[in-house]
Regions:
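Conserved ABC transporter NBD signature motif
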Residues: 54-72
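Catalytic Walker B motif of ABC-type/P-loop ATPase nucleotide-binding domains
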Residues: 151-155
Length: 208
């Protein structure tokens, strides 16, 4: 499996965010997106997730399902946790699991995902009572509940304490070991080998 971008360009709100952006990320590898605010890190993740149109260039995911759009093979975790306050922790995750898989999800699968992010003891608690860090953990539980080969993570450590970050890094590490791909916009050093794509207002550069 390999994610390949060739001469990508993105325009948002009539402003060109980036252009001529090319990179390759093989299966089992992660790429960290770096740079100051407003240079296009979030826009790039949203573009790969199919939420922003490709203005120019090509984007391919080889080794995946050829007849399935990249967006349907990816997990996108943005700044918003997208939870319903009135639903319980378990109900929120079950909803997203059904939505992402188009099929019922076994209770054991939901429990395992909640356990992976440290929320199993709060399964029956309405989401409105969760702290910001717990809400982030619940959003991250989608990664464990439904298997998808491409993870697109926008500041995934936001609001997480040290334990929460450790659980996230464990999830990402297992995903990479299984041959998955991860792109993460983050200012936090990741505890595994990553390639870095640095974006800047004047352009971008790639670093090992």
């Amino acid at each position: 499996m390999e994610l390949t971008a060739q001469s990508l360009a993105c325009v948002r709100g009539g402003r060109r965010v980036f252009q001529g952006l090319s990179f390759k990320v093989p299966g089992g590898a992660a790429m960290a997106l770096r740079g100051p605010n407003g240079v296009g890190k979030s826009s790039l993740l949203r573009l790969v997730a199919g939420l922003v149109p490709v203005e120019r260039g090509t984007l391919t995911l080889s080794g995946g399902k050829a007849d399935t759009p990249i967006a349907e093979q990816a997990h996108y975790l943005g700044h918003l946790d997208a939870l319903k306050p009135a639903l319980s922790v378990e109900e929120n995750l079950s909803f997203w699991a059904r939505f992402l898989s188009n099929a019922p999800t076994e209770p054991e699968q939901i429990d395992a995902a909640l356990d992976a992010v440290g929320l199993i003891d709060l399964a029956a608690l309405p989401a409105r009572y969760l702290s910001a860090g717990q809400r982030r953990r619940l959003a991250l539980a989608r990664l464990a509940a439904i298997k998808r080969p491409l993870w697109l993570l926008d500041e995934p450590t936001s609001a997480l304490d040290t334990e929460g970050q450790d659980r996230l890094f464990k999830l990402i590490g297992a995903h990479l070991q299984s041959g998955g791909i991860a792109l993460a916009a983050t200012h936090v050093d990741l505890p595994f080998t990553v390639e870095t794509l640095s974006l800047a207002p004047a352009g971008w550069e790639r670093a090992a």
